[in-house]
């Protein structure tokens, strides 16, 4: 049976690649973007019968509710949800504007919460559905300058772990995708890097520069990640959390080893509370 996909951030990058993979697979897509005119090529290529473009800013809960409602009315069901929209700016904690910090959390975390909440009644009534949260390797590690973005991604992992337990009995599956570098514009023009203050040049400044230099040569290709999503979708028991990319596997493994070693080092003190 063909599936109906609801995808946020469908106009470019990973969201567009997943939308195209779903459509090439014979499915239909509720394609959302802040600027729906950017979805014109997708509609022209696959037809308005299978591509339903919807304006959506995921930080606006009322807009989320309306987008889900209109998409559901168009196709009669929603089978797959891809929470993909998000962005990162780079700044030291001491330097970052509080409004910028909150805006990143709103887009990267609350957008996931809003969309997940909006689709749950539909999926629960259907007794089926699969929600994919596009998180990041940054949901398992920390990098200087990405405090807002990575705080949100860590929270997406926690939120989704709880959500999976709440909805499993309804036939709803949850998968958190945790990619490393993806060959998109994430670290290019999409990312703002305010002036880094002198004390943080060696940490935040150096890391921001490394992101800029690597932009366009990241390991993972959006279309290949889209194929991974299709494969996971076909699994009877899909993973709750899935690292994506050789860099993600490497760095997450190293981070887990460091944490395990620290836990073991301080084990005796940890047990002293009883």
Swiss-Prot record:
GO terms for molecular function: oxidoreductase activity. The keyword NADP applies. Its EC number is 1.-.-.-. NADP(+) binds at residues 14, 32, 57, 84, 117, 149, 153, 182, 184. The active site is at 135 (proton donor), 149 (proton donor), 153 (lowers pka of active site tyr). SMART domains: PKS_KR (SM00822). Keywords: NADP, Oxidoreductase, Virulence. Induction: Expression of the botcinic acid clusters genes BOA1-13 and BOA17 is coregulated by BCG1 during both in vitro and in planta growth. It holds the Pfam family adh_short. It is an enzyme of class 1 (oxidoreductase). InterPro entries: NAD(P)-bd_dom_sf (IPR036291), SDR_fam (IPR002347), SDR_oxidoreductase (IPR051911). Gene3D superfamilies: NAD(P)-binding Rossmann-like Domain (3.40.50.720). Pathway: Polyketide biosynthesis. Belongs to the short-chain dehydrogenases/reductases (SDR) family. Oxidoreductase; part of the gene cluster B that mediates the biosynthesis of botcinic acid and its botcinin derivatives, acetate-derived polyketides that contribute to virulence when combined with the sesquiterpene botrydial. Botcinic acid and its derivatives have been shown to induce chlorosis and necrosis during host plant infection, but also have antifungal activities. Two polyketide synthases, BOA6 and BOA9, are involved in the biosynthesis of botcinins. This is Oxidoreductase BOA17. It comes from Botryotinia fuckeliana (strain B05.10) (Noble rot fungus).
